[in-house]
Amino acid sequence: MDFTLLEKAILDWIADRSDNAEIRMQIRSAYPAERELTGTGSFTKLAVPPNVPKTDAKVSMDPNIESDEWDASGGCVLFMVDGKIDTLEIYTFGEQFEPNIKSWKLT
């Protein structure tokens, strides 16, 4: 399983803005382990290699998502568990969620 283009862009956006080296390292080494589509979003469980250091820091910002391919804007949350990134939630405020959109703006 690979990251969708949107998932990859979100993780890169968060890593580029994080001042925590461990979070950046975790994001750069993570890969998707499973994905659940909910109808208005998705939950992607992330796997991080065991040799990547944990952190006490939290992800401090998650981008808003705008795309003409959705019927409303959306957002995301990168959850952490026991010092490692764990799950990326992506959601739309509308009723139409397409995980493989081709164009978007993260703010």
Regions found by a protein language model. Give the residues of each.
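N-terminal domain-onset segments
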Residues: M1-M61, P99-T107
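Short secondary-structure capping micro-motifs at structural edges
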Residues: D62-E66
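Short, compact, well-ordered microdomains
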Residues: S67-T107
